[in-house]
Each structure stands twice: as C-alpha cells, then as structure tokens.
C-alpha cells in the first residue's frame, strides 16, 4: 500500500559541525544511536530494561533531554533530531556523563512515530520550540497539527503527559486548539489554556533568542485520559445537542 508523502516540518541545512561532533557521530553512535530497521522498535531491548520512558522530539542541541537523563538515571530517554550537529553535541554530553539511559534517533519524527514506535510506549512526550514557520504560506509545514497530536496521544500510556512550548503566539494558539480538540488529551491547565514553565525545563537557546526579540513563551501540558475520552463519547451519544453547545463553548474559551 502506498503511503502518501507528508509535508516535512524541517529543512536540513548545512550547519557547522565541529571536529568533536563529527568524531562523536562516528565513534559514539554505536553506543547511543538507534538504527531504524524493519518493523517497530523494541524499546525494552534497546534500553536493556523496562523503566519509565520519555521521548523528546526535536531536541536541538540536547539541553533538555541531556539534563533530564543526567538527573533521572532510573528513567529512559529517547530523543529524535534531524540536525546532525545537535545530535553530535548530545552524544558528547552523554559520553562525558557516562549516561546509560539515553538513546538517539536521527530521522524525521513524523515517520518515526508513524512507523517505528508502538502505541502506549511513553510516560512523557516533550515537544519544545518546534520550527514556527512563521510566514503564513509556510504554516502547512508546522509540526503540531491535529494528525500529529493524535499520533502523540497514541504513543502515550494512559495517564502519560504531553508537554509543548513555543515562543510564537499564533503557533501557541494553534497548539492549544488542536490539543484541546483531541479526545484523548485532558489539559493540565485549570482554564484549559497555558501553564507555567516547568521547573525541569532549562531555558533553551531558542527560548533565549525569542526573549531577546521580545517574544513571549507559551507552555502547554496535557495528560492522556482514556476515561475522559470514553465519557465524552458516551455523553455525545446521549446528548447530541448539549455536546454541540459544549464544543462551541470550548471554541470560544480557546480563543
């Protein structure tokens, strides 16, 4: 069966790579890199254990996932990033700290989630500062849309958390709309909008750059809630008129 090509959310640019990063990609990849073969990945075999597991998509230079993996050796961390200099930098950090709980994939995250990761694989998924594609004609390239959020929700275990952040307001509003609309996600914000920056997330270079440009930062947090999804489905079937009113109210609240 032919799978339609998706619009990529990234452009591979020839970024400057240091000699150390080049060596890391050659020498450290066998220890930390994950090769994509046929079929879904066996994450328990890759990490050599069954432990709480987090995924970071688009980790940049590894500021967040590197810190978390160092601080929480009892948890396993999988990072996905397409830009090789950032991958090399994280591999160097992992080797210096002798991390045993970190693995890296250098590939398109959309394809990895769709083809290589089993549903219910993660306790936490992080997507911080994806490319905002700020020009309107490029909005179709944005990573966070309804289809991708549905994939993220599927990869979470029940009760698992999804966290996102951006420094572009209209992208934050798009994230909010699609996440609030997903039937498997329940907002961790009391008013179904944004949450404070979590303490565990250090300010990234993208965040610092945005602050210098006068941008705000918007954090979002959700939990996977199969119970909420089932209740909403039952309520919609029993009260179709009330459900339509609820949806309209939600749209107004989400601005």
PLM region descriptions:
Residues 60:
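Conserved glycine-rich SAM-binding loop
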Residues 144-158:
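A short glycine-rich, Lys/Arg-flanked "PGG" loop and its adjoining helix->strand segment in the class I
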């Amino acid at each position: 069966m032919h799978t339609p090509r998706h619009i990529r959310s990234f452009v591979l640019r020839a970024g400057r790579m240091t000699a150390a990063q080049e060596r890391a990609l050659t020498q450290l990849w066998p220890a930390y890199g994950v090769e994509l073969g046929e079929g879904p990945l066996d994450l328990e075999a890759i990490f050599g254990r069954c432990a709480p597991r987090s995924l970071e998509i688009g980790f940049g230079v590894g500021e967040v996932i590197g810190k978390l993996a160092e601080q929480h050796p009892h948890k396993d961390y999988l990072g996905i990033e397409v830009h090789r200099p950032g991958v090399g930098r994280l591999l160097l950090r992992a080797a210096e700290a002798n991390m045993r709980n970190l693995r890296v994939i250098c590939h398109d995250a959309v394809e990895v989630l769709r083809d290589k990761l089993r549903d219910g694989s993660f306790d936490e998924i992080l997507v911080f500062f994806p490319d905002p594609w700020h020009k309107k004609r490029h909005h179709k390239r944005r990573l966070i849309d309804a289809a991708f959020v549905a994939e993220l929700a599927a990869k979470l275990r029940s009760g698992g958390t999804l966290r996102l952040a951006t420094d572009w307001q209209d992208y934050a509003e798009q994230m909010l709309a699609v996440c609030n609309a997903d039937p498997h996600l329940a907002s961790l914000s009391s008013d179904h909008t944004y949450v404070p920056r979590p303490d565990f997330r250090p300010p990234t270079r993208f965040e610092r750059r945005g602050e210098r440009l006068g941008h705000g930062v918007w954090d979002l947090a959700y939990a996977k809630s199969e119970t909420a999804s089932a209740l909403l489905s039952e309520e919609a079937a029993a009260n179709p008129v009330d459900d339509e009113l609820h949806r309209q109210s939600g749209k107004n609240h989400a601005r």
